[in-house]
A protein has these predicted regions:
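Catalytic core of pol beta-like nucleotidyltransferases
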Residues: 1-27, 35-41, 52-103
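Short hydrophobic/aromatic beta-strand micro-patches
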Residues: 48-50
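Conserved histidines in hydrophobic membrane contexts and catalytic metal-binding motifs
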Residues: 30
Length: 103
């Protein structure tokens, strides 16, 4: 499997924006090896997600994860802004690049 580039990931997510927004997502950002240009053939895609108030449910979280994995063809590590580690959260926020921004 060839590594995904940041451009490819953002292009795929861009095409999925209507479906992603329909799940109540207000912000979707990519971080980690893909953003740094260090992803390998077996790398996952690290994604930070923020839902609209009252829209975050377990079912929507899983649906988003499944959608991204199916379309990216890779495992996706999906993390919500609320679940960020106090130790690594600031690093992730600094590195994250928005693919979908709040409207």
């Amino acid at each position: 499997m060839t590594p995904l580039t940041k451009h490819q990931v953002f292009e795929i997510i861009g095409h999925l924006e209507p479906e992603i927004r329909a799940l109540g997502v207000s912000r979707l950002a990519v971080f980690g090896s893909v953003v740094r240009g260090e992803s390998g053939p077996d790398s996952d895609v690290d994604v930070l997600v923020q839902f609209l108030p009252g829209s975050k449910t377990f079912e929507r979280f899983l649906a988003l994860s499944d959608l991204l994995e199916a379309k990216l063809g890779r495992r996706v590590e999906l993390v919500t802004t609320e679940a960020l580690s106090p130790f690594f959260g600031s690093h992730i926020l600094a590195e994250a690049q928005d693919a979908i921004r709040a409207a």
